[in-house]
């Protein structure tokens, strides 16, 4: 029997809009007990918004501390460098038979091109071991090394990511191609589904984290992958609609 224990491996957003704050809020709203292994910290400094990776040994000790917990799903968020990603992958390989959602965060302005390239290669190694990946357009372009300029390009990118080992893919398009509609493409290796909702003129900080953690939550609650993606899309829409100055709000009044 599945437990209600669910893990987020993600970073700390100092303003609590995204990252582990969004993950834990999403888990709680869905009646689940959330755990966190912190991959990085953030702060606003004289250089701007900075990401500080957790020391690799300390990160590994966090995962070791959680090794005996019977998780029913895991969501992977920002893995700031290859060392942290490698330790996360080792941990994931040991968690057999449970859903794993990978939000392949690759776009941090603090990262140099070579670091992004190395992290890209490392994240691709996760693909065979996760249930679904949820890249945005920029991340999908970096992962596939193809330009995405249309809905058809999104579908081709999803197919390519599947051929690279991902079981299920959601390419998040946002309002890139239609200013009034937010379009995402889901692909399971056989069928496409275009997820479509109106664009809200609201703060959407944390939307990507919430989307991935919502998918993970729905999988724990017994939904199929396609059902989980659809439920997560609707949940994120409402979270954006109720957002505040710091990001989306998961625990809005229903």
Q: Can you name each region flagged by the protein language model?
A:
Residues 31-33, 192, 218-232:
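Phosphate-handling active-site elements
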Residues 141-142, 201-225:
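Short, small-residue alpha-helix embedded
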Residues 77, 91-118, 125, 129-137, ...:
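Juxtamembrane transmembrane-helix boundary motif
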Residues 2-8, 20-107, 254:
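Conserved N-terminal subdomain of the carbohydrate kinase-like
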Residues 116-191:
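Conserved phosphate/ATP/ADP-binding segment of small-molecule kinases
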Residues 15-24, 209-212:
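Short glycine/serine/threonine-rich phosphate/pyrophosphate-binding segments
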Residues 10-15, 192-205:
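Short pre-catalytic strand/loop immediately N-terminal to key active-site residues, enriched for Gly-Thr
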Residues 53, 226-254:
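Charged C-terminal helix
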């Amino acid at each position: 029997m599945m437990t209600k224990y669910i893990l987020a491996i993600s970073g700390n957003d100092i303003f609590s809009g995204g990252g582990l704050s969004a993950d834990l809020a999403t888990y709680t709203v869905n009646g689940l007990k959330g755990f966190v292994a912190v991959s990085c910290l953030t702060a606003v400094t004289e250089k701007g918004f900075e990401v500080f990776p957790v020391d690799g040994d300390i990160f590994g000790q966090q995962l070791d501390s959680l090794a005996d917990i019977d998780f029913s799903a895991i969501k992977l968020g920002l893995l700031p460098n290859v060392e942290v990603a490698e330790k996360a992958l080792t941990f994931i390989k040991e968690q057999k038979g449970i859903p794993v959602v990978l939000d392949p965060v690759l776009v941090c302005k603090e990262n140099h091109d070579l670091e992004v390239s190395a992290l890209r290669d490392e994240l691709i190694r996760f693909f065979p071991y996760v249930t679904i990946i949820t890249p945005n357009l920029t991340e999908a372009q970096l992962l596939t090394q193809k330009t995405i300029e249309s809905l058809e390009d999104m579908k081709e990118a999803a197919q390519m990511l599947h051929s690279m080992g991902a079981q299920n893919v959601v390419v998040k398009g946002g309002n890139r191609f239609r200013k009034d509609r937010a379009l995402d493409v889901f692909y399971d290796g056989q069928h496409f589904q275009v997820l479509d909702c109106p664009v809200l003129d609201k703060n959407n900080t944390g939307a990507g984290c919430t989307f991935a953690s919502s998918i993970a939550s729905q999988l724990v609650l017994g939904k199929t992958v396609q059902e989980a993606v659809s439920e997560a899309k609707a949940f994120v829409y409402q979270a954006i609609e109720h957002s505040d100055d710091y990001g989306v709000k998961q625990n809005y009044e229903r």
